[in-house]
């Protein structure tokens, strides 16, 4: 069996209880099935431990793997499985396969942000292909994704993710569940993309406002957003929303951020210009 490669951020998940937790979180039986079996996308199948369990559920598995040695192992291991479809390559450089509506993955932690953006999209361009996304991620990131107002983990990433999907922490995973053991704790999360995110007048402006608001999170919003909109305009918008005039970015929930975005766009349209690099998801 190939040894985990550091350059690919590989850590084999060896705890069968965590594999079972991922399967339960995927809720395969709850997906609406037509005449054909459900298609599942697995990013980074590794040695195929989770793949084997998925195939046992009767689903079609599209597995994307970048490691050539692992691809050879997987082809040999699942040679007699007509429902196993291997794609060799870098997931971030490949188009999304059109069939899967469920995604599961134990992914390199340094690529989690880029992978999330690819499978969820952005406020301006949501991806609505998947009914459910189950990921094994660093515990710190899991806490950020599901964090609420007032917590240290709450930030622009929390709001962008929650705008696009419901996020649940399924279970925590200790380093001992992997080989080799990583230096951090992990967690299984389930993302349920929203079929139609809450309308906002200008999603690019909303995204830009979040970045600016949380770039100096200890500042009051009237100051943090001062480079975009006059302080008096921000203060008036907060008052209209019946929010604390001294509020900081971390104190507003998602509905208030959406409302604030629309109000500031309306009150200061000439200043509400989004930098070109933020107009499209990267």
Swiss-Prot record:
**Chemical reaction(s) catalysed:** adenosine(1518)/adenosine(1519) in 16S rRNA + 4 S-adenosyl-L-methionine = N(6)-dimethyladenosine(1518)/N(6)-dimethyladenosine(1519) in 16S rRNA + 4 S-adenosyl-L-homocysteine + 4 H(+)
Superkingdom of origin: Bacteria
Which residues does S-adenosyl-L-methionine bind?
Answer: 11, 13, 44, 65, 90, 106
Keyword match Methyltransferase: yes
Q: Which GO terms describe its cellular component?
A: cytosol
Q: Which SUPFAM superfamilies match?
A: S-adenosyl-L-methionine-dependent methyltransferases
Q: According to its UniProt record, where is this protein located? A: Cytoplasm
Q: Has UniProt tagged this entry with the keyword rRNA processing?
A: yes
Write down the EC number. Answer: 2.1.1.182
One of its Pfam families is RrnaAD
**Protein's job:** Specifically dimethylates two adjacent adenosines (A1518 and A1519) in the loop of a conserved hairpin near the 3'-end of 16S rRNA in the 30S particle. May play a critical role in biogenesis of 30S subunits.
Q: Which family does it belong to?
A: Belongs to the class I-like SAM-binding methyltransferase superfamily. rRNA adenine N(6)-methyltransferase family. RsmA subfamily.
Cite the NCBIfam families for this sequence.
Answer: ksgA (TIGR00755)
| Name of the protein described by the UniProt record | Ribosomal RNA small subunit methyltransferase A
Q: Which gene encodes it?
A: rsmA
